[in-house]
Amino acid sequence: MKLFKLSIHGFRSHQDAVFLPHDGINLIYGKNGTGKTNLLEAIHYTCLTKSFLSTSDSDALHFQAGHFELEAVLQSDSENESKVRVYYSPAEGKHVFINKTPLESFSKIVGEFPCVALSPYDIALTQGSPQERRRFLDASISQTNKAYLADLLSYRRVLAQRNKLLADMKHRTFSSPELDVWTASLSALAASIIFRRIHFVRDFAQYLENAYADFQSIDETPGLTYKTELSLNENSFSEAELAKQISEKFEEMKFDELRRGLTLFGPHRDDLAFSINNLSLRKYASQGQHKTFVICLKLAQYFYICELLSEKPIFLLDDVFSELDSQRAEELVRILSSKRSGQSFITTTERKDFAEVKQHTIGGIISG
């Protein structure tokens, strides 16, 4: 996947800007506060209809603008060209168009223009709450598996309905036929989601090990494990077996859920555990090891999506060089400039002397 042209109006700090990137690595440099991250956000919006930061659409509005509009020309690795337009205003909401055709559902774009983003905030993947790691799981699988995304969205809707019913029934000591219906639906969706997540983690482990191996200066073995309350046979289990266990678990927790008015079990409460050399990353790793793990997670995510889709994602790396020493920075550039990598965008506060990198000043982009 390649971005040929990006036009920006009323987005963040950019009132009007046009960006014409190159193939391979694009390094965007400039002082802090000049809109470098905003540019990466705009690219992410055109690929996935949202920012890679936890912000709302209204937050992305330029302070002098009543709406923002992004237009991107993208080309797949098979040379199919697409034009994506994202429009947002507080009055009209968000609208997304692909080749002038409006999207009925924003989820339809997921996986069409694969994109991976890495920012300093991603340290939350290893140091933050389980929600951050579930979000990573869902983003990785959803871009490569539309059935998973459909089940995930359905699960969230059913979970909300079940939680509402549980809240209404709070402190009762008996169930109801309506709750049983929602529980059966949630159990089936939960089994599908957990089944795919576990298989993803097993496959992804090799991509993570490969990402570590790409850095010659690192001599560590990473690991990850899916954490759920279910008792699973590590060698073999079926989706049907998962569904049976989940139904039994809900039956076991029924009275606790009625007492608390909340769904207490399911993939929305699961987690990922990370390790280095078989030791817990959270408990034993240094800050530098955490940063390295996050970078390798994102590289692994990039190459995982690339292989499953047979399409190289666009890679957005915000201020990544501040997290790396000079040797690992050079190793990262070598990885990103290899034939198996595609187009990438790296922001930094100063110009870097890498032969493989096309340099852009943020001021030059803003002036269009």
UniProtKB/Swiss-Prot annotation:
One of its GO terms (biological process) is DNA synthesis involved in DNA repair. InterPro entries: DNA-binding_RecF, DNA-binding_RecF_CS, P-loop_NTPase, RecF/RecN/SMC_N, RecF_2. Keywords: ATP-binding, Cytoplasm, DNA damage, DNA repair, DNA replication, DNA-binding, Nucleotide-binding, SOS response. GO terms for cellular component: cytoplasm. SUPFAM superfamilies: P-loop containing nucleoside triphosphate hydrolases. ATP binds at residues 30-37. Pfam families: SMC_N (PF02463). Belongs to the RecF family. This is DNA replication and repair protein RecF. It comes from Chloroherpeton thalassium (strain ATCC 35110 / GB-78). The gene is recF.
